[in-house]
Amino acid sequence: MLKVLVTICIAFIYLPNTSSAQFFEQGQFIKDIENRVLWLRCSVGQVWSPETKTCAGKIVKLNQEEIKVAIIQAGEQLPGAWRLPTLSELESLVCSSCTPAKVKNKYFPGIAREAYWSGTRNSFNRNMFWSVNFQTGHKYSRFMAYQQLPFLLVQDY
């Protein structure tokens, strides 16, 4: 009995980290089981190429008001209710061991090495929103709503 228990304990030590199974590819979408969201795997402005397995096109940078219009347009072109990711959801994409861009390129190719909008406002200054910089992997709340940054879209599932 003790031998079986020791074997089970050792097996759990060597199980792969569950965070490595966070993402599942679904064509132009990434299913994120940790956050229970579906990501558009390319930055807004880019399109997914299944042949090259990469994002093509120019990344669009918008301010928070312009993003509201882009979200409406995304809803007209793709099924579901799209939105900006929360700070927590966006931070979950950071791969600290990756070289810049600090994101798992397999799932999110073409991410710019710069700050991306989240939909989370700064609670101390409601004119500012949190962002995640994929050059460094750090979060910041130093951008005003009128500034233009790239962004990703998600929907709940």
Q: Language-model segments: what does each one mean?
A:
Residues F24-Q26:
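Short, small/polar residue-rich loop motifs at catalytic or cofactor-binding pockets
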